[in-house]
A protein has these predicted regions:
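A residue-level marker of the well-folded mature domains of exported/periplasmic proteins
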Residues: 1-327
Length: 327
């Protein structure tokens, strides 16, 4: 007799119950970005296996360990933690609770812990493809960025990859990389908007705004420009921001995507099936559809970008990363 779906976490320790917990990084679970995508993937997996899924929103980084510990104490089977900054707390918890599977989204594992899988992405690949598109679309040869902090490797990989791709497509292009200072790097839409506005005023006509709410502020600002979608464009990040930040639609060329929903869902499913392995799991990356700007992107540009995506996938194109993290 198959047990019915698990509907709460009062008895997660029981063999027939499946409980999956997710701890967000600082920010809300509906952040229209990272936390939200990981939570959607977790929910999809829970639905398929008849499991119970619950999240805890982290308010302050000092609460990481405590939040993870709440799920562990309730004997959850699988705990997903979101974001590079939770890496250490996740490793400590995995060592303390060897019978629980941990999935660290954006947490590269230096040495493998058997019950901890790091879901990592080649951000430099998605960034490079987006940059290549920007290099072919710019009319002013000035390309801008408004990024989270480069103290978080995935953000730096996006930025450096973007710059490398833009210059590969257009050696004349001038690419400005601007990172937010580490404090509140992903929660500062005002900075994202002001930085994007400044670069538009300096002649940039394609801007990559990447970094949670900070980047979203940039996208929304660029979309207000009278030239949005004709002479001025923006590029989003992580997930297809056409759907998460609809205000950006007028300027949005594409988004440099990490397939977070799919990656999280795949690993949670593997965990529940008892097939998850410790170490790193490389999730898929790509570019989101052109949507409203589809008609202004020439066919030869689309074809060139497809070729670049194929070259990144088969390894024939080198982005210069991850070595770029050292410069």
């Amino acid at each position: 007799e198959a047990a019915g779906p698990t509907t709460d976490d009062s008895d997660c320790g029981a063999e027939e119950n499946i409980c999956i917990g997710l701890v967000t990084d600082t920010g809300k679970v509906d952040d229209k970005s990272f936390n939200q995508a990981a939570w959607e993937g977790t929910q999809l997996a829970a639905e398929q296996v008849g499991g119970f899924a619950k999240y805890i929103e982290t308010v302050d980084p000092k609460d990481y360990a405590n939040n993870i510990g709440q799920f562990a104490a309730a004997k959850y089977d699988t705990i997903v933690t979101v974001g590079f900054l939770m890496g250490e707390a996740t490793i400590e918890a995995a060592n303390e609770y060897p019978d629980i599977d941990f999935i660290g989204v954006d947490q590269f594992q230096g040495e493998a812990v058997p019950n901890l899988a790091g879901l990592v992405f080649r951000e430099d690949h998605a960034g490079y493809a987006a940059g290549y598109l920007a290099g072919l679309m710019t009319q002013t040869n000035k390309i801008g960025t408004a990024l989270g902090t480069d103290t978080v490797p995935p953000v730096k990989l996006f930025g450096e990859g973007f710059k490398a791709g833009a210059i590969a497509a257009n050696p004349e292009a001038e690419v400005t990389l601007v990172y937010h200072e580490p404090n509140n790097a992903f929660g500062d839409p005002e900075w994202g908007a002001a930085e994007s506005r400044k670069q538009l005023d300096q002649g940039a006509d394609v801007i990559f705004a990447a970094g949670g709410a900070t980047g979203n502020g940039g996208l929304i600002e660029i979309a207000k420009d009278p030239g949005a979608g004709t002479t001025v464009f923006c590029i989003g990040v992580d997930i297809d921001q056409y759907f998460t930040v609809p205000q950006a639609a007028p300027c949005l060329l594409t988004s440099a995507e990490k397939k977070l929903v799919l990656g999280t869902e795949t690993l949670v499913m593997a965990s529940v099936a008892g097939e998850m392995e410790g170490g790193n799991f490389v999730g898929p990356t790509g570019l989101a559809p052109y949507h409203d700007t589809d008609s202004v992107v020439p066919d030869d540009v689309k074809a060139a970008v497809e070729e670049v995506l194929a070259g990144l996938a088969d390894g024939s194109i080198d982005t210069g990363c991850p070595a770029c993290l050292d410069n």
